């Protein structure tokens, strides 16, 4: 065992004796895929089936540690299998100090209402399953022309997130229960794994792997610190579970709620462990999908009986929580947010209604009837002579989105012209802060030249004239450096594309034209309209008649939602092995555990008028 950092032996740092509850919680078994074949791993993380076939069986037993720290070895790998989907392992963990460390920092409310009925082993399984849900295989880095052999695999590490696809593990009290949630594991590999695991466990006997609590605490804290910047950690864990084909797992919750979720009744127990599957849907709609191959999965247990009706005093939140605790029927599901589901239903119904009932034919009046039925001019109407919407001379206003597209196109043309001519080219006056001042502002007032008493100036001063360039340096700060040319053309182009899509959607859903106007504003029948009365006769010869100008009403603001830009995933870097720097062989391995790091510092960018224009326009939409 490695020496302690302060020079004393590690044996002296081990606590006297672990607690009785910690001994009762051991051993536990862990299993999962160390790598999946052809699932998208890149670079040195790629592990082919040919390499695995050459590396099995390993030349030496593979230890299991925490986050690649050799000083925190907590178990060993019992069996490895080359499955059709990937490399699968089954291991044993027997470290009472790990159970004491996790139980000592867990809050009593973590286990919820089921805390009195949980055994010490189940408590440890909940803690370790949610703190270290992933696995990382450390392999030796091969030379360009080197072939894999039995020394390829170095060790297996329990971690928060693995860099390889589908590397989620399950912890349980027996090897059989540990392997059961993996639905993609072939029966041949399952039988071989269980047989080899039982034989290896019998050979090990009651061996334990004691670790100093200080080393455990330091490693567990470093795991939390190095992964605190991981974005959407539990979403990634859920995706990795689906990639590995895990279904019906008990202890991995992947929930944002602090305590463990509780059901309406006590969970059913089979063989000393909990088999009730806890699942909750928050703010979403669960939609069942057909199972591939036409076969439905059979549930492991019959559905639990419905809970008793809640008392009248129970709040709506409690009723919603009790309803969400019901077990879902077997099958594959997709969780859709309620708002998006309602929007899909409304759009589907609207499309069906428009298809079933096409817009009515346009309504046309004869020339004489149209002249008689046309109402007098009203404020806000478009068209010739202030006609009503159903009048033949009515001109429909252009959509507001088309005006925005035209403005965007003009901004793009200006940006291209600036890039083509440069800062000193023709047609470019320079940035606003470098142009001569056009007027004097009240809050920038200073004494006119020749009147301040600070010196004589022969030049004449005229109101409204800007200050010349030869003013003393204390009047104005030196001009800032010329900003770089605009780089927002791509953003403007994407905004134009999105606006064009919205225009096409609006035209498809709400067509403009006489047909639409006739449907929305039918003509008022049997309402004769008298000619407009004037208070005084118009004067002849007094000049041309003044035609009243009517300001067009603004088009209604379009309330279409713009698709949000997906956040870029957090940059994941390889985690260095935790241990003394002088330990040999650390740099020669490939550790597949993830660690989130801070993004590189971005230099401040100059203010871009095009970006400001796009931001202001999008904010008003």
UniProtKB/Swiss-Prot annotation:
Residues 601-621 are annotated as: Interaction with major capsid protein. Residues 266-277 have a biased composition (Basic and acidic residues). One of its GO terms (molecular function) is identical protein binding. InterPro entries: Herpes_virus_sf, Peptidase_S21. Keywords: Host cytoplasm, Host nucleus, Hydrolase, Phosphoprotein, Protease, Serine protease, Viral capsid assembly, Viral release from host cell. GO terms for cellular component: host cell cytoplasm; host cell nucleus. Residues 487-497 have a biased composition (Low complexity). The gene is UL26. Its EC number is 3.4.21.97. Belongs to the herpesviridae capsid scaffolding protein family. Residues 258-277, 295-322, 420-497 are annotated as: Disordered. The active site is at 68 (charge relay system), 136 (charge relay system), 155 (charge relay system). The keyword DNA damage does not apply. This is Capsid scaffolding protein. Residues 331-350 are annotated as: Interaction with pAP.
